Amino acid sequence: LAGVEGIGVNYGMMGSDLPSPDKVVALYKANNITDVRIFHPDTNVLEALRNSGLGVVLGTLNSDLAPLASDASYAASWVHSYVQPFAGAVSFRYINAGNEVIPGESAALVLPAMKNLEAALQAAGLSVPVTTAMATSVLGTSYPPSQGTFSEAALPTVGPIVSHLASSGTPLLVNVYPYFAYSADPSSVRLDYALLSSSAAVAVTDNGVEYANMFDAILDAVYAAVEKAGGGESLELVVSETGWPSGGGGYGASVENAAAYINNLVRHVGGTPRRPGKAVETYIFAMFNENQKPEGVEQNFGMFQPDMSQVYHVDFTASSS
């Protein structure tokens, strides 16, 4: 898989005024974006992705986890509807069963859903890795990074998932948002540390390891938790979401900060202190500002407006991979 650890972008669709899927795919390609993540199967979008050359992360609806987990035939029909018809012409990177459902009432559904999807894909002769996407709220301890552990609420679910993924060599997807840590406690977190703008290692020295930015510190806390939970040092992480809002009234939400974070990120994702030299496959959140998301910063994570004009410029050719 050499050369695929590029920068992808999440294509959210919670907007009433978004461009047609074919225009969106063309916009990805025009901006040298190599990969796309979609949160649920949409056949119009999958049609537009045919022969596009884009790598695709395909999510399931969280509401589909229950039937996917309990009914192998439902998983088979899901694969038959959304993967099989496109498999030759769409480059599926991963299928992620559920987004940020651990910990919670649906958490126990994730691994059975993953296994049923894996069996359905195998029966269809398709080799697409199946994983899930977690928020960093699964961590009980995240500071310092080497002490990272999963919370007592998350560990009973996450532990078996981590072991399962490690045995198949499939990465775990994690959503990493320094913005929310910064905006919740701006007096304790330096802005340049959150924005990946610091030229000096600041704020965190962990067993002699220096962290110059929060993105690496959060990732390494998850790596430490994964290792403690039985994933060993072989299980890789993919950052399935990260972003910074350009407006919406949140503390530190500005076009200037969003542009700094995303451009610094594109240049940066070449490895963390705990996993040096290993490029981190990363998906920015998000392609567009989406007017059907909750009001405030949630509507302002896009790099583009719905009319396809830039909110701020991102140079994707600068990717460190």
Curated annotation (Swiss-Prot):
- Asked if the record carries the keyword Disulfide bond, the reply is no
Q: Sorted alphabetically, which keywords does the UniProt record give?
A: Glycosidase, Hydrolase, Plant defense, Signal
Please provide the Gene Ontology terms (biological process) for this protein.
Answer: carbohydrate metabolic process; defense response
Query: Which major enzyme category is it?
Result: hydrolase
Q: Where is the signal peptide?
A: 1-6
Q: Catalytic activity annotated for this protein? A: Hydrolysis of (1->3)-beta-D-glucosidic linkages in (1->3)-beta-D-glucans
Matches recorded under Pfam families: Glyco_hydro_17 (PF00332)
Q: Which domain of life is it from?
A: Eukaryota
**Which GO molecular function annotations are given, in alphabetical order?**
glucan endo-1,3-beta-D-glucosidase activity
Q: Does the keyword Hydrolase apply?
A: yes
Q: Which residues form the active site?
A: E100, E241
- Give the EC number: 3.2.1.39
Q: What family does the entry list?
A: Belongs to the glycosyl hydrolase 17 family.
The protein's job, in short, is:
May provide a degree of protection against microbial invasion of germinated barley grain through its ability to degrade fungal cell wall polysaccharides.
Name of the protein in its database record: Putative glucan endo-1,3-beta-glucosidase GVI
Q: Which organism is it from?
A: Hordeum vulgare
